[in-house]
Structure formats: C-alpha cells, structure tokens
Amino acid sequence: MTALFGPRDAIDRAAALREAGASGVFTFEGPHDVFTPLTLASTVGDLDLMTNVAIAFPRNPIHLAHQAIDHQILSGGRFTLGLGTQIRTQIEKRFGADFDRPVARMSEFVAALRAIFAAWETGERLNFNGQYYRHTLMTPTFTPRDNPYGPPPIYVGA
C-alpha cells in the first residue's frame, strides 16, 4: 500500500503507483476528503483501496456505511475501511463533535456499522440501539443493491 493524497492527481498517481508495482493505495483524513481520491483511484483497475484513517466521531455510522459500501462496489471488493478516533482537541474544536469515552464510542460505532451492513446483506430489520448511536429504520429505498462483495473489512487504529 502506498499513500494517495489529493483529488487533483489521484487518477494519474494511482496509475503510476500501479505501474510501479503497488498493490494498493490509501488515504488519510488530512487536507482533503478521505474518500474522494479513492473514488477516483477506483477507476484505475485492480488496486486495493483503504482509508488510513477516516475519522469516525464527526460522522454518523449510517453515512459512513454508505460511503464504505459504495467504495466496496467501486473497487470490486477491494476496499478496507480504516477508522480512527483522532485526538480530543481535533474532535471537539475542529469538528465540533463529542469525544467522551472514545474507546466505548468507537466500539459502538463499529458495532453500528456491522449492524447496518448485516441489515443490508440479510434484509432483516435494522434495530441497533446503543448508548451513542441508534439506527432503527432502513427501508428498501435506502438499501444498497448490486453488491456481490459483502461489507468491507473494518480496521481500527488506536
């Protein structure tokens, strides 16, 4: 895996990295959106794609689940969702989000993602009720289709 940075050169950089023998590319939550360069890199071919890391707490699990599934589909099943907490100052002052009990919050965030993915895969009712997140509605209109790859692996940075 090799770092992929901004969106402007993501396609050319991903193609050059593939030509040089890289098996995949990753992005981090920095000066650009963590997903956009991966969306562009997915057009290059058989590269593995990974967020390293997407910051979880400013996002909602349902929103992130949609982004992850779309990248899993775009990459042909070669996407890995890397998540992290960031640090208190960044979460509270930059993103305006809560940072209390980060280990418990991250654990629940991942559990919510898995519950959402399972509802999409099985068609069973979504019923996730946690301390930080609650997801109890998933109608067919909002359920991704045409995903033969299943949910992506989830890695959590500490």
Language model segments and positions:
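N-terminal beta1-alpha1-beta2 module of alpha/beta enzyme domains
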Residues: 1-51, 147, 151-152
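Active-site beta-loop-alpha junctions enriched in small/polar residues
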Residues: 3-4, 30, 54-56, 84-88
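N-terminal, well-ordered alpha-helical segments
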Residues: 15, 36-39, 62-69, 73
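Residues at secondary-structure transition points
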Residues: 32, 59-62
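A short, GP-enriched loop/loop-strand-helix hinge that lies immediately N-terminal to
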Residues: 48-54, 80-81
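Glycine-rich "substrate-gating" loop/helix at the edge of Rossmann-like oxidoreductase active sites
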Residues: 54-60, 98-99
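Internal, glycine-rich beta/alpha segment that forms the wall or movable "lid"
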Residues: 67-68, 73-158
